[in-house]
């Protein structure tokens, strides 16, 4: 079973706080808003964020951000989550770290006449990326993650991805991972086993061109300053009966 999600994402410049000697942006404060829904999602997700990015020189960029993630459902009150993130880019390398923390408590919900417990799953991730110097529209990413479930085993593992900026307005990313999808909410007893692997394709259409120059690090850093933050926007929810569910690989 697969989910198809749709989202609209907007980054707004709040202020160019500093420029370099050539008049190019050096420090940027920005806000970000995103709305998403999906097949089988039972609702929608809104993300609101604030961030700052700074170029200390022509070959690097450092940034920090904070997000409020709001998961609305058609069967109960909304869930909310706080996100904190940091990023560091140097030449062809990219490093990111994000933390996701529940704001709302565990709650009782009724879905199709059945009572469950439901809560936001806390988690974190770390990502390392490498952009090919002679083909900067191509990048490779490895991301480690952990999602802290309460009534079943945690979801920990890796995601590998290949990203391709096919045109200035179209970006594609193919990925493989053992990460449980947060697009829709699944009862713990119906979650994948701990040894299962998934793959997928992401497509990003942009209104403004995204252009990377060959070994032109300054230009590439300026391009990255106005790109949406890379993080998990979907709010992962745990739905359970309140008893522990073993999802370990069976010996059979």
Language-model regions: role of each:
Residues 1-2, 14, 35-41, 52-54, ...:
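Transmembrane beta-strands of outer-membrane beta-barrel pores
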Residues 15-31, 55-64, 92-97, 135-142, ...:
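Repeated loop/turn-to-beta-strand initiation elements of outer-membrane beta-barrel proteins
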Residues 103-141, 147-152, 165-173, 177-252:
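Flexible, glycine-rich linker and terminal segments associated
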Residues 2-8, 27, 41-48, 60, ...:
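Residues that define the transmembrane beta-barrel architecture of outer-membrane proteins
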Residues 8-12, 48-52, 84-88, 126-130, ...:
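Residues on the lipid-exposed face of transmembrane beta-strands in outer-membrane beta-barrel proteins
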Residues 1-24, 33-36, 248, 252:
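Outer-membrane beta-barrel initiation region
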């Amino acid at each position: 079973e697969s989910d198809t999600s749709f989202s609209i994402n907007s980054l707004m410049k709040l202020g160019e706080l500093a420029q370099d000697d050539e008049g190019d942006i050096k420090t940027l404060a920005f806000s970000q808003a995103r709305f998403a829904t999906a097949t089988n999602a039972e609702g929608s997700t809104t993300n609101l964020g604030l961030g700052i990015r700074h170029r200390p020189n022509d070959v690097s960029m450092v940034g920090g951000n904070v997000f409020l993630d709001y998961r609305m459902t058609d069967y109960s009150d909304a869930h909310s989550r706080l996100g904190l993130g940091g990023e560091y880019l140097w030449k062809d390398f990219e490093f990111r770290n994000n933390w996701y923390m529940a704001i709302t408590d565990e709650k009782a919900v009724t879905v199709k006449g059945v009572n469950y417990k439901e809560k936001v799953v806390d988690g974190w991730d770390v990502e390392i990326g490498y952009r090919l110097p002679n083909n900067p529209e191509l990048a490779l990413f490895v991301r480690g993650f952990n999602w802290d479930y309460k009534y079943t085993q945690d979801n920990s593992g890796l995601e590998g991805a290949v990203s391709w900026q096919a045109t200035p307005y179209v970006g594609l990313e193919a990925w493989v991972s053992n990460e449980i999808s947060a697009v829709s909410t699944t009862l713990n007893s119906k979650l994948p086993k701990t040894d299962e692997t998934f793959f997928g394709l992401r497509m990003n259409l942009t209104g403004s061109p995204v252009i990377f120059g060959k070994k032109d690090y300054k230009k590439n850093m300026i391009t990255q300053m106005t790109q949406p933050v890379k993080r998990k926007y979907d709010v992962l929810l745990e739905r359970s009966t309140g008893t522990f569910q073993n999802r370990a690989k069976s010996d059979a």
